[in-house]
Amino acid sequence: MTKVLVTGAGGQLGLELCRQLKQAGYEVIALTKKMMNIADQRSVRHSFGHYQPDIVVNSAAFTSVDQCEKELDKAYLINGIGAYYTALESTRIGAQYVHISTDYVFNGKGTQPYREDDPLDPKTIYGKSKRLGEELIRLTTKDSTIIRTSWVYGHGGSNFVETMLKLAETKQELRVVSDQIGSPTYTKDLAEAVIKLFSHPPGIYHVSNSGICSWYEFATAIMEESGLETAILSVTTEEYGNKTPRPAYSVLSHRAIEEAGIRPRHWREALREYLQERSSACD
């Protein structure tokens, strides 16, 4: 039985990965941040040496964009050095290595979907720390798989969908930016693609649901699919006043995954399923 070690197993993607891996018949080693500190090489070496996985999926990350600006050391340690240690120790034991990255490694000023080989030009500490992770991985091994994704949401996590639904409980209207464009990604679809890519050549892949929207359109869809009457008001990024800059354009090209035979469903269809599952779980 193929043994897969998942870092960040307590996060929304890690939870879904572990669930699907078990269903697919893999032996799963689910490591949370309390069980292994990816920024501590001795901790990583001990865990990898003890479990001897065939495949490592590094889904551990410090993803709070605003907090990364305040805690630079933590951001670079987890997203940069942690990626290096997990890649290095995977190589040492001969394990296949898969790393989850982000659209934030690009500058967000594009007008066409970002291709896998487009130059990296991050504008935030979060993006810069994730770029460092990618660079260190590529220096460590040529056989890694790096999967960039965007606008991720899923069960058991803190995300945009859950934030909107929580705010809708107490507010009659919500202000949401309409000039930031991207593609939402449901963890169920992301995890499915990650597992499929185990059997494809190493390299860089972009995975998100298909279709594009603004955060305003995404929020409107959340309310419509949930049957809620909370009004969504369109505002610009400048009017909203984020402390940390957000990419205006985050759409990722699916060229590589389509060549691998992976064609993600539309984001609205994925959102509908997520909300239905969420509702059923609450009944």
Swiss-Prot record:
Extract the PANTHER family matched here.
DTDP-4-DEHYDRORHAMNOSE REDUCTASE, METHIONINE ADENOSYLTRANSFERASE 2 SUBUNIT BETA
Naturally occurring in which organism (per UniProt): Bacillus subtilis (strain 168)
Q: What would be an example GO MF term here?
A: dTDP-4-dehydrorhamnose reductase activity
Q: Which domain of life is it from?
A: Bacteria
| GO cellular component entries | cytosol
| Annotated signal sequence range | none
Q: Which GO terms describe its biological process?
A: dTDP-rhamnose biosynthetic process; polysaccharide biosynthetic process
Q: Which Pfam families match?
A: RmlD_sub_bind
Q: Which family does it belong to?
A: Belongs to the dTDP-4-dehydrorhamnose reductase family.
CDD domains, A to Z: dTDP_HR_like_SDR_e (cd05254)
**Keywords for the protein's UniProt record, in alphabetical order:** NADP, Oxidoreductase
User: Which lineage ranks, top first, belong to the organism behind this chain?
Assistant: Bacteria, Bacillati, Bacillota, Bacilli, Bacillales
The record's section on InterPro entries has: dTDP_dehydrorham_reduct, NAD(P)-bd_dom_sf, RmlD-like-bd
Protein name per UniProt: Spore coat polysaccharide biosynthesis protein SpsK
- Gene symbol here is spsK
